Amino acid sequence: VKIGAWLATESVSLLSSLVDSLLDAGSSLINLFAIYHALQPADREHRFGHGKAEALAGLAQAAFIAGSGVFVMLEAIDRLFNPKAIDNGEFGIGVMVFAILLTSILVLFQAYVVRKTGSIAIHADSFHYRVDVLVNIAVIMSLMLSSYGGFLLADPLFAGAIVIYMGFGSWKIAIKSLDDLMDKEFPDEERIKIREIAMAHPKVHDIHDMRTRRSGRYSFIQIHLEMSRELTLVEAHQI
């Protein structure tokens, strides 16, 4: 539908929405594979499981978003210096309203899934569709200003703003994915909570060498516990 709307209007802001939607479809397929792989149980060669497949998918999505953003930005710059009137603006606006309704339903469902699972891949995918909603709103404003207000520069300016937002989202997804891949430690407040839980045991005198990391939706915590030397090895192991 968006392809038809773009061909009818030749709007560069609508092109940005079209590219974003195509990117969303490709990213969702990547996520399907990544989540399936991440849910596979640990095996002999992957003792900590396969959770990092989600982070790899998130990193790939960040690259796709950045690449599509560069393409649209080049088109927007060309249209900025070569303004063009928008044709069939009403058709384009109708398509965008329809797209907003469908995408909003999907975003609400994905937000629910992310709260339940903490999936990086679905979080990245959800960002794509949230961007899609904002992009569609911006496209509607652009088409209205260009078609009815005679402000031809609205089209490339709105497209440029959309690309900047896409770039910011791409950066955030990339950082989150890299943190997971590089085994970044938990935030200080979470480490403090872990220490409090460990120290609450009456036979634990102190802890040291705490190490934490995440792999997909799984969290791993390693701690050295200091206990009385009078405890037997069996008792210490049970603690």
Language-model features: locations:
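Alpha-helical transmembrane segments and adjacent TM-loop junctions that form the membrane-embedded core
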Residues: 1, 7-19, 23-239
